[in-house]
Amino acid sequence: MYAATLAVVADWARALELPVALLQPRSADAHETPLNVRMVRMALGARAVIAVGGGLEGYLPALERALQGKTPIRTLLDHLRPTPDDLHIWLDLVYARQSCEQILRWAAQDGLLGLAQRQAWRRTELLFRQLAVRMREARTTLQGKAYLAVHDAYRPLTQQLGMRSLGSLQPDHERPPSLQAFRDALARARRARVAMVLCADESPLGATAARLLRVPLVLADTLEMPDPQRDYFTRMAGLIDALQRAV
């Protein structure tokens, strides 16, 4: 069994018919998960820990010390080409597909690549192709549209859609923006003829900005929080559709 640091990584492993457990607690997002005893125990019982790396999971150095070499930690970022400039690799279909391919290579090294996994990879390839079709269709309506986000984790996707990011209303998760910074962001958005405001959850800050700018507020899933009801491919399709519906 593998241990995945993030829900999206666990979804990829499950799509490939590989046994996997999720370290990330349901209530914590990808950046804010603190290391706890449950996570260490789960990792100790795994064949390997599969992580994004690059500092995304801030607890990885502490987990590595706790494991004392008993379970290897494998990071996807070390195998993605070209090297991503944004850690939200799951929102880029090219990097997401490369990640699945790397997980399969690790499975082969571990003796876990059988007929079921090869068949699962063919199904997974089809799911990626279907998402790519959705992307091309969405790009025809979204290309050139500007957006403002409460916290802009969307750029790996929005860049592929040809959208223009106007930055984050709240770059720091922990601190709300100053009133002047908020006004400056709104002024910048008006000059750019912003089309929408994006937020991952019900955000008073995002709602206020959307109301003042008179544009739609889009609840746009960053896929950072686990969702037991929907897998990676369903959530990505939903995110693309949510952006497209806003224009």
Where are these regions (language model features)?
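Extracytoplasmic metal-acquisition and chelation regions
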Residues: 1-247
